[in-house]
Design a protein with these regions (language model features):
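Phosphate/diphosphate ligand-binding glycine-rich loop within oxidoreductases
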Residues: 2-104
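Alpha-helix C-cap/termination motif
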Residues: 44, 107, 131-132
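Conserved beta-strand elements of the Class I
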Residues: 4, 114-116
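Phosphate-coordination loops involved in phosphoryl transfer and adenosine-cofactor binding
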Residues: 109-112
């Protein structure tokens, strides 16, 4: 595989269609149901670049020689580039969400922010709001973690 997506279950993904239509290269979906399979896949390093989806955005970080500061802050890598056998980990959600905020004039400086939910984009949203100077950030969740200050 040269380019593709790894994750536990990929039936929901439109990544193959999007990448092949817009970029003109083959993009493979590679379901890896177990962490053991992910570790073996990363050890082989037989890819040029991959995207990573749940539940492996944290475990892949162990295999990266370099991790982008945004990915470190979010504690999740969703893109890995193989450069001569060294794996470089990035999180494209952070710049993507930042771009959307800029495009729509969303300001965070000295504001109070409410984030609804603790799903996949929570940490990204929180990090962008924090980095852009939010005064306070609250999270409301159906499954709160009181240690993180989350509420129902």
């Amino acid at each position: 595989m040269e380019y593709g997506l790894i994750g536990g279950r990929l039936g929901h993904s439109y990544s193959k269609v999007i990448h092949e239509m817009l970029c003109g290269y083959r993009y493979d979906l590679c379901p890896l149901p177990t962490e053991e399979e992910v570790r073996a896949f990363l050890t082989r390093r037989q890819f040029r670049a991959i995207n990573v989806t749940i539940p492996y955005k944290l475990v892949v970080m162990e295999y990266c020689s370099y991790i982008d500061p945004h990915a470190k802050a979010i504690n999740a890598v969703n893109t890995i580039v193989n450069r001569n056998g060294l794996l470089y980990g990035y999180n494209t959600d952070y710049p993507g969400f930042s771009y959307l905020c800029d495009a729509h004039g969303v300001e965070f400086k000295d504001r109070t922010v409410l984030i609804l939910g603790t799903g996949g984009t929570h940490n990204t949203t929180w990090a962008v709001a924090h980095d852009r100077g939010a005064k306070q950030i609250y999270t409301v969740s159906r499954h709160p973690d009181p240690e993180k200050g989350e509420q129902t």
